[in-house]
């Protein structure tokens, strides 16, 4: 299994051209093993819609239901272990709580994280597909 950063999940569902060919290959490759989506990504999507930073073709609740039903997608709960890990990441990591939780989720599950976020890509304490 790999863990998807929120924007990767949204781009994949929307067929967004910002996904690189390598990222598309990884999504196909790991589909049978699991594409983990942190529960916090659902909140992130809802907040992006609320702030008009993301437009969806249907109500956000419907979109989430459909996007979570995509082949290989596994919703990963925000467990107490992940919550604590997100506050104790090694070395200084940026302050976005959602990114902290997504990184902690990947670390807790011992899975690679797929992202295009420069701040996460420069963080050496998480396994990344890049």
Predicted regions and their residues:
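General small-molecule cofactor/ligand-binding pocket signal
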Residues: 36, 76, 129
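Active-site neighborhoods of divalent-metal-dependent phosphate/nucleic-acid chemistry enzymes
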Residues: 57-58, 70-116
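Alpha-helix capping/helix-boundary segments
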Residues: 8, 41-42, 82, 102, ...
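Short, well-structured N-terminal submotif of metal-dependent ribonuclease cores
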Residues: 1-37, 51-66, 109, 123
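Phosphate/NTP-binding elements of NTP-utilizing enzymes
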Residues: 45
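Acidic, PIN/NYN-like endoribonuclease modules and their adjacent C-terminal/linker elements
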Residues: 1, 103-130
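Histidine- and aromatic-rich ligand-binding microenvironments
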Residues: 5, 38, 94-96, 117-118
């Amino acid at each position: 299994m790999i863990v998807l950063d929120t924007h990767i999940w949204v781009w994949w569902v929307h067929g967004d051209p910002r996904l690189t060919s390598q990222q598309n290959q990884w999504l196909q490759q790991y589909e049978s093993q699991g594409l983990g989506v942190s529960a916090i990504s659902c909140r992130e999507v809802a907040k992006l819609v609320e702030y008009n930073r993301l437009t969806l073709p249907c109500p956000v609740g419907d979109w989430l239901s459909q996007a979570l039903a995509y082949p290989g997608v596994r919703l990963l709960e925000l467990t107490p272990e992940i919550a604590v890990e997100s506050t104790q990441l090694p070395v200084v990591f940026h302050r976005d709580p959602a990114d902290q939780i997504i990184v902690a989720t990947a670390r807790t599950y011992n899975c690679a994280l797929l992202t295009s976020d420069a701040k996460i890509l420069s963080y050496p304490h998480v396994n990344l597909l890049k």
